[in-house]
Amino acid sequence: MTNPELRGGSFLIIGFGREGRSVLDHIQSLYPNARIGIADQGVPEDRPAGVELFTGANYLASASLFDTIIRSPGVSIRAIKPHLSESSHLTSATNIFFAECPGIIVGVTGTKGKSTTSSLAAAILSEVFGDVRLVGNIGAPMLNHLQGATADTIFVVELSSFQLEDLRFSPHVSILLNIAPEHLDYHGGFEPYCAAKANIARHQLASAILITHEENQLLRDITSECAAMRHHFNERLSASSTTYVTDGTIVIDQGGYRTPIARTNDLPIIGPGNLQNSLAAITCAVALGGTIEQIQQGLRNFKPLEHRLEFVATRHEISFYNDSLATIPDALMNALVALGDEVETVIAGGFDRGVDMTPLGPAFAASKVKNLLLFPTTGQKIWDAAIAAQPQREYTRVDVHTMSEAVQAAYDLTSPGKICLMSPASSSFSVFTDYRDRGEQFKDAVKRLAPQKKL
């Protein structure tokens, strides 16, 4: 088999993490005699045999020496382009996968909710189809899952803006959930970030399907030239949405024939953001021919994901929730709405990507939050937003530098019967390896707390 994204006789893999290793295995299986290089700032612990290695500060300069350059998602196109020759072909594992995939691809993206929506869509579609594979940003590298796939295989692919930025294909079914400012340092601003997200629909044919929120004007604008059939979802009664909510019931509309699916408070995930995620996943199943019974069974079988409004434990009658994947203000705001007036303590803050924190002020003002436990560097911005929105309000502020310190402060300050929410509204990289590390440290610290405080 040949792949049009793998051109010439030499291949350079830029970035040798989990996805880079998957690309190496894939290329070697297709072209066992090819010249292959690996370029990475660091030296791989287990250097593969038979490949050239380029490391150090100038590792990208090696790009001009190869026919095809495969970048990992974390390496920006802007950084690579100055090092390409005129004949270089720059691609990615995502492009390679799309060019080679024999099955039906359901692509999911959005600033927030894509992991939950992808997982829920896969759970529901598994009740409809025999071979459903959840891959991409959420699971194992997508190239690992091509083996044994057929035209009937359904791939549910979570796609980040990094993966979409240079994508030359679009899924058969594209779900575009929402867009809010994120990764602005990587993309160079909000407009190029939106353009990257819009790539999920840019190459769709008239036979394809695009699923978006009916009332999201930004999504309408950036997909205005998309040729695909459109399906919408809405949290309100709507005559033009495939899936909508009325009187607390999710309803699907199939050509004017309306059928209730589930009560919103019976869903396995909570909060307004997760309601939208559920509606999008249900709409996808409807568009692909799922029955009412299959959709309902998929909803019943779904297990909520870690680090997304995850209940951890109760200590001294304080409920601790882990929302570590909340890396933007919108996510924290949704969490406050989802958990309601019982939230008394919020742990927030982290790496500063230049995202505006001022929307958090009104959200805190509308809440019953009393204690703000803040990590650098966005902790100060979050505090400023809270005070600017309600200067007379007396919050207790604690600046923290470790998760153990934050959890102990929450334990000391939060009233019995109330909630401590760890929802950072920021990236994790200033203190933690990633959002998983941050969430695991939170859970570990909570579980070490005494069940009851000593009198």
Language model features with spans:
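N-terminal leader/targeting and accessory segments in enzymes
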Residues: 1-92, 392, 449
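Nucleotide phosphate-binding/pyrophosphate-handling subdomain across enzymes
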Residues: 2-10, 20-26, 131, 263-369
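Residues in the short beta-alpha loop(s) of Rossmann-like NAD(P)-binding domains
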Residues: 17, 42, 138, 216, ...
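Phosphate-binding loop of NTP-binding sites
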Residues: 28, 60-66, 73, 77-214, ...
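Short internal beta-strands
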Residues: 36-41, 210-214, 345-348, 368-377
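Beta-strand->loop->alpha-helix junctions that form or flank phosphate-binding loops
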Residues: 37-40, 56-57, 91-96, 227-245, ...
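C-terminal helical cap/extension that packs against the catalytic core
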Residues: 47, 358-418, 454
